[in-house]
């Protein structure tokens, strides 16, 4: 059996992860990217400025931790954002500290969380801006709530940022003799390849007729910080009278030197947050494509609300399927 050839469309985190995993197993990988390496995780190597909002890597999966540590050193970072509300600043994640801040009261650390207060001041306006429709109170059941004092926004064993940025980490993933990268826009045509991995938006594939909607975000850079002095690098803007949903002091987050603040305003151009009407039908369509040698991967490729660790796990699953198919 000769060396298998793989075509990967997209050099974001999903594409780079798949490329490296398969290259290490002896596959010949051609990866195509129409813009720059990094996708929505792209940052500036010199200043560490993150172009598409704050990215903080976190996971509890030992396999994922071992994988990323092959390509980057990480510095620890614990994400404890601040909510900017009509009642003033409140600490996140949601805990009794949040309620103390909102009510301006001294409360026992074991006091029950006031869900009504959380919904009215943290969730309602933020969610309406983010998703373009009123929030349902049932969303409280899906939120991580600390009964006592709050910890990290992410309840994972590993949390931090690569010291040289995510872009550098992904470039290191592609540094393998079995990987060739071409900066060119292409489609899913697999002529000349044994398998194709698609990490672009799934609704750009030929024949994809399942309904996928996207919420886009406009990213606005500023030198002046309206929230100065800050209590944390990341502020969630939970009030209706400001358009933005989030404001990040990038240097405070990354340790860089861009001197820039990044604001996120919902409903801009781009495909950032997927909304799938029928997940089961979409997954069935993806499974049918796999039988034809076309594998969808990543946040855009599967229209899934993945964090970075989820994306790498998804890449591992896709590569495992391909390797098993080769053995069949």
Give residue spans per PLM region.
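Conserved Rossmann-like nucleotide-cofactor binding loop
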Residues: 14, 37, 203
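Conserved flavin/dinucleotide-binding core of flavoenzymes
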Residues: 94, 249-328
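Short loop/edge segments at beta-strand edges and connector loops
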Residues: 33, 78, 181-186, 298
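Glycine-rich FAD pyrophosphate-binding loop
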Residues: 23-45
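Mid-domain catalytic core of redox enzymes
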Residues: 25, 186-285
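A conserved beta-strand/loop capping segment in the N-terminal third of enzymes
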Residues: 42-50, 57-106, 146-147
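N-terminal Rossmann-like FAD-binding beta1-loop-alpha1 element of flavoenzymes
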Residues: 4-31
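Active-site/ligand-binding neighborhood in enzyme catalytic cores
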Residues: 83-195, 199-207
């Amino acid at each position: 059996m000769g060396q298998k050839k793989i075509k990967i469309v997209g050099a974001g985190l999903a594409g780079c992860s798949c490329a490296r995993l398969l290259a290490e197993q002896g596959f010949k990988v051609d990866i195509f990217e129409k813009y720059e390496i990094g996708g929505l995780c792209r940052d500036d190597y010199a200043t560490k400025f993150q172009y598409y909002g704050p990215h903080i890597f976190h996971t509890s999966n030992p396999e994922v931790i071992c994988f990323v540590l092959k390509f980057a050193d990480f510095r620890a970072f614990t994400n404890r954002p601040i909510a900017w509300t009509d009642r003033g600043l409140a600490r996140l994640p949601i805990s009794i500290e949040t309620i103390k801040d909102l009510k301006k009261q001294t409360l026992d650390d074991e006091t029950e969380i006031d869900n009504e207060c959380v919904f009215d001041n943290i969730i309602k306006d933020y969610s309406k801006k983010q998703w373009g429709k009123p929030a349902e109170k049932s969303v409280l059941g899906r939120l991580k709530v600390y009964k006592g004092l709050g910890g990290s926004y992410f309840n994972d064993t590993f949390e931090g940022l690569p010291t040289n940025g995510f872009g550098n980490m992904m470039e290191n993933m592609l540094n393998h003799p079995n990987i060739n990268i071409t900066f060119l826009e292409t489609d899913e045509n697999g002529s000349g390849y044994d398998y194709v991995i698609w990490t672009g938006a799934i609704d750009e594939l030929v024949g994809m007729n399942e309904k996928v909607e996207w919420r886009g975000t406009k990213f606005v850079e500023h030198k002046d910080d309206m929230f100065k002095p800050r209590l944390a690098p990341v502020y969630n803007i939970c009030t209706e009278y400001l358009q933005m949903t989030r404001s990040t002091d990038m240097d405070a987050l990354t340790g860089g030197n861009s001197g820039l603040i990044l604001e996120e305003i919902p409903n801009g151009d781009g495909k950032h947050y997927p909304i799938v009407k029928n997940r089961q039908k979409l997954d069935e369509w993806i499974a049918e494509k796999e039988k034809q040698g076309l594998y969808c991967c990543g946040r855009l490729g599967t229209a899934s609300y993945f964090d970075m660790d989820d994306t790498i796990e998804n890449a591992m699953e896709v590569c495992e399927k391909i390797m098993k198919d080769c053995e069949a």
